Amino acid sequence: MAAVDTFLFTSESVNEGHPDKLCDQISDAVLDACLAEDPDSKVACETCTKTNMVMVFGEITTKANVDYEKIVRDTCRGIGFVSNDVGLDADHCKVLVNIEQQSPDIAQGVHGHFTKRPEEIGAGDQGHMFGYATDETPEFMPLSHVLATKLGARLTEVRKNATCPWLRPDGKTQVTVEYHNDNGAMVPIRVHTVLISTQHDETVTNDEIAADLKEHVIKPVIPEQYLDENTIFHLNPSGRFVIGGPHGDAGLTGRKIIIDTYGGWGAHGGGAFSGKDPTKVDRSGAYVARQAAKSIVASGIARRCIVQVSYAIGVPEPLSVFVDTYGTGKIPDKEILEIVKENFDFRPGMIIINLDLKRGGKGRYLKTAAYGHFGREGADFTWEVVKPLKWEKPSA
């Protein structure tokens, strides 16, 4: 048999103790607190952090009574930042708050100061968003991204359950997968390289780190079929990684948008998700575009699909909707586009209702802020629900 043409593709992830991800989680914890008391809250909450300091700032209009400082400290503590030697002390760090109300110009243009019916609500800003899906995993997500993300989540799990007590909160993962292009569909052949850089305490040796990571992190996450004697492992390749979290690097909300989405596959319009209420189409538009792309692939209409939607501020109807199935569609893309338009309402007010996006609290949005917004399980991830699509198979 002739050798199959293959290529390498890499995706990375960071876990919840990474400074940028810490900021995403604080911003979404603030959003949860606002929506829990006032589902109509307008939230644009940014967070930044550096040694011994966390600042939340932005525009928030809400009837909720929000204790910003408590949310910051609780979120940092929940991640594991409980002393300066791990990178931040949740109970003693400086917390700065600079929150103002949403601009009345934006409020009028988008919501008509709450006088508009849901279908009349305009987009909160201009922009274009993408949704992507592929049949290469049960989650309809790229394998390189799924594995990198799950390695990061597993690192946190074995830290918190004390399987690997030497672990500290900060860490990064990266997975290179060897793929075959099957007429536009992506078929994973094997895992080429696994990279893990994790923060650790002073007591552990590099050999112990490598052995524990292989046994307790890599083995449970990466299916055996993808690993072989040629798979390369880089486990803390720089040597020591004791100083981490905000003490090691500054952090900022919205800096990990590829990790939040598809690991470099598909496309990205550039807008971050965390700290934004659902009238911000950066978030809600990307969520409905994912649901549309996933439903196309799950319905068997195509093996791989990308959907783009675009908006103008204050205008409810999207300016454009685009579908590309990379040549994997069972019917022409223009027919698939019509199916998408018939089955999905891209007006912001209707996305909010159909995906129940005003329901915050109980960590709903906080959950999205680490380990990806897509390919996740649970009732809170409403955009992952596949909509059954009717289509006519072309006669042979």
From Swiss-Prot:
The UniProt record lists the EC number as 2.5.1.6
> What is the annotated role of this protein in its UniProt record?
Catalyzes the formation of S-adenosylmethionine from methionine and ATP. The reaction comprises two steps that are both catalyzed by the same enzyme: formation of S-adenosylmethionine (AdoMet) and triphosphate, and subsequent hydrolysis of the triphosphate.
The organism's taxonomy opens as:
Eukaryota, Viridiplantae, Streptophyta, Embryophyta, Tracheophyta
Provide the residue positions that the database annotates as binding L-methionine: E59, Q102, D249, K280
Which EC class, in a word?
transferase
Q: Which GO terms describe its molecular function?
A: ATP binding; metal ion binding; methionine adenosyltransferase activity
Q: Per the UniProt entry, what are the Gene Ontology biological process annotations, in alphabetical order?
A: one-carbon metabolic process; S-adenosylmethionine biosynthetic process
The answer to keyword Transferase applying to this record is yes
Catalytic activity reported: L-methionine + ATP + H2O = S-adenosyl-L-methionine + phosphate + diphosphate
> Whose protein is this, by species?
Triticum aestivum
Name the positions where ATP binds: H18, D170, G171, K172, S238, G239, R240, F241, D249, R255, K256, A272, K276, K280
Know the name of this protein? Answer: S-adenosylmethionine synthase
Cofactor(s) demanded: Mn(2+); Mg(2+); Co(2+); K(+)
* Cofactor: how and how many bound: Binds 2 divalent ions per subunit. The metal ions interact primarily with the substrate. Can utilize magnesium, manganese or cobalt (in vitro).
| SUPFAM superfamilies listed in its UniProt record | S-adenosylmethionine synthetase (SSF55973)
Give yes or no: UniProt keyword Ligase.
Answer: no
Q: Which UniProt keywords apply?
A: ATP-binding, Cobalt, Cytoplasm, Magnesium, Metal-binding, Nucleotide-binding, One-carbon metabolism, Potassium, Transferase
Subunit relationships: Homotetramer.
Specify the pathway.
Amino-acid biosynthesis; S-adenosyl-L-methionine biosynthesis; S-adenosyl-L-methionine from L-methionine: step 1/1
Q: Which InterPro entries match?
A: ADOMET_SYNTHASE_CS, S-AdoMet_synt_C, S-AdoMet_synt_central, S-AdoMet_synt_N, S-AdoMet_synthetase, S-AdoMet_synthetase_sfam
Query: What family is reported?
Result: Belongs to the AdoMet synthase family.
PROSITE patterns recorded: ADOMET_SYNTHASE_1 (PS00376), ADOMET_SYNTHASE_2 (PS00377)
Q: Where in the cell is it found?
A: Cytoplasm
- The gene for this chain is SAMS
